[in-house]
Structures are given as C-alpha cells and as structure tokens.
C-alpha cells in the first residue's frame, strides 16, 4: 500500500494511542540510534533544535532528519568531534482505514462501517518548545552544527528554532 502524506498525521487530534500490549501488528520504528558521535567527551558548546508548534513527527521523518544531521557532522567534524542526541521517541501508533479503489471497489469495501483502522506507522508526539535534537561540539565546529540542525529541521513537519543551550560566550 502507498504511504500517505505526513499532513494526515501531523496535527494532534485525538487522544494518545500507545498501549502496544493490546495491539497486534505494530510496525517497528525506523529510528535505531539515539546517541551518535563521541559519547564520552565533554564539549563546551551545546546547540538544540526546538519544535515551535505542537505536532506529531513520524518515525520516518525523525530518521531522515537524524541521517541528514549525522552525515553533515561526520563529514565535517569526524566521528569523535561531536555528540548528537535525538531526544524524542516515536511511541504514538498511527492507524489508517484502508480504502479500496478501482473498478468494483464499492462491492469489496465496507466504507466507514467498522472504520477503526489498522496500525500503519509510529510517531513522536511533540509539544511546543520541546527539544528534538541536541548537538554538542567544540567552538570551531559551531557553524557546521548549526547548519546540520537547520538541514534536519527541513525534514520535520513543524517550524523549528535553533538555540544555543551552553557556551554562548564562546560562539559570539
């Protein structure tokens, strides 16, 4: 089946749907790595990507943003020159009431009768001003980290803001 556009799931409309204990067939998350780079070093500058609006971010968008930011940081600073953390987890289970299309679909499908839907994906529910990504770097890689977060923000379905959490005096 074709993947639906993210605009179908972006807005938070209903109550949370996370109890996997009662569900069968929940697809696994594509996001596997939540800590990237050098996890042991202590970096003086921390930059964070914040969501400006309340929304749901699908696990595919989180993985695309993570890959983009990680690739930009790895090529510029190397594996040991940064630490990046993904701060949200896709707990929310998304459902879809599949519709049959084409000739004879009216005989096959039941329309809106029993329209609860099947589990198709997972998403992270994000509130306004919540941290999504944090990158810790040395001051010489600050511009690269900021650009990596900007690129990652373009993959997400909400407007984002980049703020410096720690080390503002070093990057002026």
Swiss-Prot record:
One of its GO terms (cellular component) is ribonucleoprotein complex. Keywords: Ribonucleoprotein, Ribosomal protein. This is Large ribosomal subunit protein uL16. GO terms for molecular function: structural constituent of ribosome. Belongs to the universal ribosomal protein uL16 family. The gene is rpl10e. Signal peptide: none annotated. PANTHER family: 60S RIBOSOMAL PROTEIN L10. It comes from the Archaea. Disulfide bonds: none annotated. The keyword Ribonucleoprotein applies. InterPro entries: Ribosomal_uL16, Ribosomal_uL16_arc, Ribosomal_uL16_CS_euk_arc, Ribosomal_uL16_dom, Ribosomal_uL16_euk_arch, Ribosomal_uL16_sf. The lineage of its organism: Archaea, Methanobacteriati, Methanobacteriota, Stenosarchaea group, Methanomicrobia.
């Amino acid at each position: 089946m074709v993947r639906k556009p993210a605009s179908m799931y972006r807005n938070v409309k209903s109550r949370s749907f996370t109890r996997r204990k009662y569900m069968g067939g929940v697809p696994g998350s594509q996001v596997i790595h939540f800590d990237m780079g050098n996890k042991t070093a202590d970096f003086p500058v921390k930059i964070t990507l914040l969501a400006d609006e309340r929304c749901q971010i699908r696990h595919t968008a989180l993985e695309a943003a993570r890959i983009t930011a990680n690739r930009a940081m790895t090529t510029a600073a190397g594996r040991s020159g940064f630490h990046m953390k993904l701060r949200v987890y896709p707990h929310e289970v998304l459902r879809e009431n599949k519709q049959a299309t084409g000739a004879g679909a009216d005989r096959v499908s039941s329309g809106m009768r029993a329209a609860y839907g099947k589990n198709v994906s997972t998403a992270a529910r994000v509130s306004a001003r919540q941290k999504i990504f944090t990158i810790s770097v040395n001051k010489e890689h600050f511009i690269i980290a900021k650009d990596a977060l900007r690129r990652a923000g373009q993959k997400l379905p909400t407007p984002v803001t980049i703020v410096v959490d720690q080390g503002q005096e070093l990057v002026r």
